[in-house]
Amino acid sequence: MLKNIACFGVAGNFTGHLEQAGEAESFSSVKTSEETEPKAIFPTFIPSDSKNVPDFLKIFPFSSEKIIYPENETKLQIEPECAVLFNAEWKDGKLKNLFPLSFGASNDCSIRKDGAKKISEKKNWGKETKGLSSNMILLDDFSENSKLYDYRIASFLLRDSNVFEYGENSFVKNYNYIWKKLTLWLIEKFNSQKDEGPKENIHEYLKEASFPEKILVSIGATRYTEFGERNFLKKNDEAVVVLYPDSKYCEEEIIQKVKQRDFSDSEISFLVQKICEKKS
């Protein structure tokens, strides 16, 4: 199903993440209406054969089980996020509205790559290079009244039988832009974002994808813990991202579930990915 859906991410929707990721300088020339506004939308997958879409963006990158380690790169990090799947309403070639369908844990896995001109160049390096949970939770409202209001994002690195907290445990409601404010911002950027600096012309990509009925958006990465900021992924690690209801579980209970590999509760969106070498 996802292979027919245009997929995007949001840069700079948690204060401090871009600085930790070493990307703040790339966005230094990007003008925003207020300090907390995200910097840009970036593409991760465009379902199109058009020559106007870069070839790497035509490759479906999502997996719920593994991440293929990039060749000739060593600085690879988990980007723990909440992903939201929307129905898209179009009129006369413009996006008019977005209606939520489901949400889940996402790993917008990224290479810390010097010299990349566009954000997307650090995001998709082939098949099985990004993460999306197989347990997407139904969502009929994207507001303070929705079930998502109660959810938190947690992330972990599993290495040598140890569990390390990778991203700061954060409420979804604490994104800089969320609910209606984020929805309106997304619609504006999908229609009008220009090809400038690290940004790309998103509307042109959507046009080449024949104005898709559904759009997946990973709405921003949390800040890293001190461990997450300093430690890159290695082969045979496992990357874990969890979206869980705060009213039902505390952080320690989630850590225990990860340690015990108890991923059974359908109210929790778990994403567990093994870091693997590319098969020759």
Describe the role of every protein-language-model region:
Residues S218, A239-V240:
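Hydrophobic beta-strand signal
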Residues K199, E213-T225:
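Short, structured beta-strand/loop micro-motifs enriched in basic residues and often containing a Trp
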Residues P212-K214, L233-E238:
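Loop/turn positions that initiate beta-strands
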Residues K113, L243-Y244:
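Short, structured coil/loop segments at alpha-helix boundaries
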Residues F227-L233:
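Catalytic nucleophile loop of clan PA
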Residues T15, A221-E226, Y244-Y249:
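Short, charged beta-turn/beta-strand-edge "cap" motif at the junction between a beta-strand
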Residues K3-A209, N231, E253-K279:
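Glycine-enriched loop-and-adjacent helix/strand subsegments that border the catalytic/binding cleft
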